[in-house]
Amino acid sequence: MNRPWLAHYHRATLTIISDSPAPTGGAAPLSAPLWHQLQLVGSVLVAIRAGTSGTAAFEAVDPALRPGVQALGFRVLRWLGRAEALRRQLAKRTPPPPADALLCTALALAWRAEDSPYEPFTLVDQAVEAAKRSPVTRAQAPFINACLRRFLREREALIATTDRELVAQWNHPRWWIERLRRDHPRDWQGILTADNAQPPMTLRVNVQKVAVAPYLSALSAINLVAKRVTESGVQLARAVPVRQLPGFAEGEASVQDAAAQLAAPLLLDGLGRAAPLRLLDACAAPGGKTAHLLELTSAAHVLALDADAARSRRIGETLDRLGLADRARVLVADAARPQAWWDGTPFDGILLDAPCTASGVVRRHPDIRWLRRESDIEQLAMQQAMLLAALWPLVRPGGRLLYCTCSVFRAEGSHQIDAFLAHNTDARLRPSPGHLLPQSTSDVRGVPDNDLGDHDGFFYALLEKSAR
C-alpha cells in the first residue's frame, strides 16, 4: 500500500511539534470559537485516518489558528483509542468519516473530566454546533447530539466497559502493545504511559557561544524555571515560544530532547575533542546533531548528508543560525550509496542516525502510533542494516561509528546491532546506553553522570573498528 506520510516519520530526527502554544515562534495564537476549532481538529483527524502525517495535516490549518487546534488535536490523538471504544458503545453503526471524526474528537476531549480543557457539557454543545455549521456533517448533527448526550448520562458505566479493552486502556494499536510486551516485559506499561504524556521542552546550549550556567541565569532573569540536563542541556518547567528564549536568534540555544543530546558526546569522547577529526553525519537533517558535534569541538569538520533536498536545506539553515556553517559541508546524497559521494578518505567517526519507526518520540508525534503498521518495522530494519553495511567500510581502523534510532523496538536497536556484530568481526561494542526508554529511571551505561531528566525513547550503540 502506498503511504506517502511515511516519509515524514521514518527519520530518527524529527521536527518537534508540541501541545504548547507556538513553541517554534510566530504570531500569538488567535482565538477562535470552540466549535470552529473542533471542526478543524475533526478535519485533521479525517486526514490522518486517510494516511496523512500529523505534521502535514496540522500545517494545512490556518497558521493563526494552528497552535490552539494542534493543542486540542494532540490530546485527541493521545486518547483516540478510548474515544473509538466509547463511540462503538454509543453507536451501532459507524457514521461517515467527517461525523465520526467530530464525534471521536468530542469524546477524546471529554472522557477525562479531571483534566479536560473544557467542561463536558460545553464540549458536547460545541461539538453539536460544529456539526450543524458544516454541510458535510449537518445531516449527522442529531446523531452526534444523541450519542454525546448519552455519554454525559452514562459516562462512568461506559468508561468502565471500555476499560476492559486493551487499545482503549493504553491508546495504542494492539500490535504495538503486544510488541512492547515482548520487547520490554518489565517496562512496557511505563513506555505506554510516557507516550500519552505531554513532553517537556529541552534546550541544547551552544557552548561555543555561552556556557550552561550563564544561560540558566539568563532564563531565570526572565522568570523561566529550568534545570540542567545532560552535558550542555537545560529543561524548562514549561514550554514557551522560541522567540522568548534568550539568545535563540543569535544561536545560543536549540530545541533538542535530552536523549538526542547524547549522540555528539558519545561519538566524540572516544576520539578526542581536540583532535582535527573528519566526521560524517550520515542522515543529518534537520541538522541538530551535526550542530552539536561542531559545538563540542572546534577542530572537527563534518560532512552532513541527507537524501532529501528540502531537508538538506534545513541543515544549512540550522548551521547558519548557530554560526557553524564554515566547518561543515552539506551534501544531498544517499548515505547507502557511498560510491556516489565518498572521496575515498576514511572517517574518524560516523554518526548514523538511522531511519526508524520513531516509536520513541510518540509523545511528540501522537499520530505515529495510528499511522504505523507492524510491517514497517521489518522494512526499516532492512534499511538500517543496509546503511550499516554501506558505512562501516568508511570508518578508519580505530575509528568509531555511533548507531542510533529514536525507536524503542528491539528490531531497530539491540537486535540490529547483535546481527551486525555477528557478521563484522572487526567491530566491537563500546560502552553505550543501548535502549533508553522514555522517562526511564534505570541505570544507563555509557551516559555521563548528569541527569537526563524527562527524555524520549532512543537507542545508542557505539561501534569501534579494530586497529590494524
Identify what each model region corresponds to:
Residues 1-468:
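S-adenosylmethionine
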